Amino acid sequence: MSKRQRGKGISIFKLLSRIWIPLVILVVLVVGGFVVYRVHSYFASEKRESYADSNLGSSKPFNPKQIVYEVFGPPGTVADISYFDANSDPQRIDGAQLPWSLLMTTTLAAVMGNLVAQGNTDSIGCRIIVDGVVKAERVSNEVNAYTYCLVKSA
């Protein structure tokens, strides 16, 4: 073997000794990428429906609800009344003459009815009526009578 041929062999060996680490890294990256590609095709291959647009195409119209709050007692009774309106906001009326009533109409799917009253006589009552049906009624007979009516879902 001549020196020239032996010199080429040594230079290739020197070249491989310098670039073997980058070559191993390149092979590991290629093999790792292929493994991830294959595993991804097994475990995440189903196409799921997007729920980004959840608007219903057609909503059925419904009749508005009518809610009536009533507070009653002996003639001349004055009461302090608290209630939730159609938007569930608390309202208060001080010194209301009885009988007292309030009619609310709403298109909400559900409404919570809450009515509280305290009068200056020994008897007071309340009633919540939803679409003509009495859903809650209570009468209290005591000194400075206090009563409440509650409908969780009207």
Swiss-Prot record:
Regions crossing the membrane: 19-39, 97-117
Top-rank lineage group of the source organism: Bacteria
Keywords for the protein's UniProt record, in alphabetical order: Cell membrane, Membrane, Transmembrane, Transmembrane helix
Compartments, as annotated in UniProt: Cell membrane
Record's GO cellular component terms: plasma membrane
Coiled coil, from the record: none
InterPro entries: MmpS, MmpS_C
Broad class of where this protein is predominantly found: membrane
Cystine pairings recorded for this chain: none
Membrane topology designation: Multi-pass membrane protein
Family from the record: Belongs to the MmpS family.
Name under which the protein is recorded: Probable transport accessory protein MmpS4
Organism: Mycobacterium leprae (strain TN)
